């Protein structure tokens, strides 16, 4: 799963979006890889949970100034606990208020590709630069 639930909508990258293509290039299992949209997809939480409850990793971006705990995430939306990645603790987040994520990845997609390879295949390929567990 990708990104977070906001006001009854959960936005995820389309399968043909830049993120969707980078996930494919990273040989990551992305639940919306078969989607043909090149932008973000507005989904209901029910749609996400129906298709993605068994995802291995949940990675998202937010603007906040401090890491989000699992308790804080559940306070925001209790449905997160239905994600297998949540119960296994495979949650990776990048705080875009403290990390130059957009500034760097916009011009260096290879940095983001590397992050996705590590997220999908483990840290045997190195340490994450942007995302934190």
Model-derived regions: residue spans:
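Short, small-residue-biased leader/transition segments that mark boundaries at the very start
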Residues: 1-5
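Second-shell loop/turn segments in exported
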Residues: 6-13, 33-36, 99-106
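Stable alpha-helical elements in mature extracytoplasmic
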Residues: 15-22, 28, 44, 109-112
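His/Asp/Glu-enriched short active-site or ligand-binding loop at hydrolase and phosphoryl-transfer sites
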Residues: 19-40, 59-62, 93-95
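Extracellular/periplasmic catalytic domains that process cell-envelope and extracellular macromolecules
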Residues: 24, 50-52, 83-87
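Short helices/loops that flank or line small-molecule/ion binding pockets
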Residues: 43-54
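Structured C-terminal subdomain patch of bacterial secreted/periplasmic proteins
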Residues: 60-133
